[in-house]
């Protein structure tokens, strides 16, 4: 008998291009990564998006009667709509019918649904969204967390983010002794606001991580750090700025290389290099951020995600499941809870 494929539940109705692009991405992922995809959403709309596809088997459809819209207040909508697609997808993980969830819908709703249905890992005060960014060193990405789950943080939250980030970096990114940094406005321990100064002291005393000091904005993509922690307010701004810079660089390259015969010749010569560069800096390649600290694997993708981004998000979910990220965080904090 073959190995049982990883099962990924996808919120098929979440996102600006749902369900068509979500379905397309699910099919791509199922073909590319050998996973089994379960699509939670309106069966009629999902089937309509599958009509042109001949590949077999197609993802399984799990009916959901409602949708949490992007403009809705997340917690209220999640509670008021128990049969919304995001809730059905989360329930599949809770009931162990799926191993992970991917959603490009209302990110606040995804977090609220995860907390209500999957709960927090014992010992974790707040979950965090971790995003992987490329650095100037090939194949040496940096994990930033939190990038949006918690606008306001306490030092102990960032300390927990550092531990969870270290586990993820070791498990999924195959980093040996991840070097942890604290996002700040200077290198000195005394620099920054009250949160930064107090967090620095706590991280320095944490023997579960390899804390090497403050990370300034210029250090983020340098390759010096493997994990950088910050509050969700600063992290979200950092993430979106980095993605915008990546988009701008790609657009500038297209504009400079396309005009005239010389541009076409240059493009042809540089095509392999340009393709590699695009794969490194295009945020679509990373698919989404992992919600760390909840009792299940949950990937939160951009609302603007299209098929390729969804497919890559499924890949990220599969990697987190197969590298037992949840179990490793659980075991780390279970020991702490028992020793308290």
Swiss-Prot record:
Pathway: Lipid metabolism; phospholipid metabolism. It is an enzyme of class 2 (transferase). InterPro entries: FA_synthesis, Phospholipid_synth_PlsX-like. Its main location: cytoplasm. GO terms for molecular function: phosphate:acyl-[acyl carrier protein] acyltransferase activity. Its EC number is 2.3.1.274. Keywords: Cytoplasm, Lipid biosynthesis, Lipid metabolism, Phospholipid biosynthesis, Phospholipid metabolism, Transferase. GO terms for cellular component: cytoplasm. Catalyzes the reversible formation of acyl-phosphate (acyl-PO(4)) from acyl-[acyl-carrier-protein] (acyl-ACP). This enzyme utilizes acyl-ACP as fatty acyl donor, but not acyl-CoA. This is Phosphate acyltransferase. It comes from Trichodesmium erythraeum (strain IMS101).
């Amino acid at each position: 008998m073959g190995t049982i494929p990883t099962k990924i539940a996808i919120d098929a109705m979440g996102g600006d291009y749902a369900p068509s692009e979500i379905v397309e991405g699910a099919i791509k992922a199922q073909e590319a990564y050998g996973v089994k995809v379960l699509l939670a959403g309106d069966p009629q709309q999902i089937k309509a998006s599958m009509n042109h596809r001949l590949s077999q088997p197609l993802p399984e459809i799990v009916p959901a009667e409602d949708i949490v819209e992007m403009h809705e207040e997340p917690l209220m909508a999640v509670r008021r709509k128990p049969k919304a697609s995001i809730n059905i997808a989360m329930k599949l993980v809770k009931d162990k019918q799926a191993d992970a969830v991917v959603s490009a819908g209302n990110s606040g709703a995804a977090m609220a649904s995860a907390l209500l249905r999957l709960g927090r890992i014992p010992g974790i005060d707040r979950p965090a969204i971790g995003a992987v960014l490329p650095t100037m060193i090939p194949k040496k990405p940096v994990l930033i967390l939190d990038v949006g789950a918690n606008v306001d943080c306490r030092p102990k939250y960032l300390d927990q983010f550092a531990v969870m980030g270290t586990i993820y970096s070791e498990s999924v990114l195959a980093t040996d002794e991840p070097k942890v940094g604290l996002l700040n406005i200077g290198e000195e321990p005394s620099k920054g606001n009250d949160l930064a100064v107090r967090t620095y002291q706590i991280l320095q005393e944490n023997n579960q991580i390899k804390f090497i000091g403050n990370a300034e904005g210029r250090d983020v993509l340098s390759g010096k750090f493997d994990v950088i922690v910050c509050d969700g307010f600063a992290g979200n701004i950092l993430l979106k700025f980095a993605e915008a810079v990546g988009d701008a660089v790609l657009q500038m390259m297209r504009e400079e290389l396309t005009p005239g015969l010389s541009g076409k010749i240059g493009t042809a010569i540089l095509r392999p290099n340009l393709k590699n560069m695009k794969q490194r800096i295009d945020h679509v390649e990373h698919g989404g951020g992992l919600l760390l600290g909840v009792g299940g694997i949950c990937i939160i993708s951009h609302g603007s995600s299209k098929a390729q981004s969804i497919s890559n998000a499924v890949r990220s979910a599969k990697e987190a499941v197969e590298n037992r990220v949840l179990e490793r965080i659980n075991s780390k904090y279970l020991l702490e809870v028992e020793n308290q």
